[in-house]
Amino acid sequence: MTEGYTNVAGQRLDLPDPTVALTGTTMGGSTYRVMGTVMQALVLNLKARQTIYTESGAMSWMADGIDMCTNTGGGLGSLLKRAVTGESLFLVDYTSERDNTLIAFSSDFPGKIIPVNLAPGQSIIAQKEAFLVAE
């Protein structure tokens, strides 16, 4: 007989750990894990006083010890560019108060998370809603 689960209230479900698709270190020295296969999530382990930013709505969960601040990300010009392209008008900064603080980000649609390290002054053009998080 194969082992399976029934729909019984209170039954424990021993689900497998999520697949870790990719691990690495950011340019700022934080470690990250890309979890999952189809609907991936990025889990960052932030260093003390490290700040990252994302568009509004991309954060899935965060641990205690992270301050959150919403801003326009560069003034009126940047705000207008994002409005014209249909992106979120506001950016959210997350700053870790201490070492080893976890925060996770995910997309609203299926796809792969690809880390891209950009040198100062380097830029990339990506499709709408492809941006997830940056340092």
Role assignments for model-derived ranges:
Residues 1-135:
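Composition-driven recognition of glycine/serine/threonine/acidic- and proline-rich low-complexity segments
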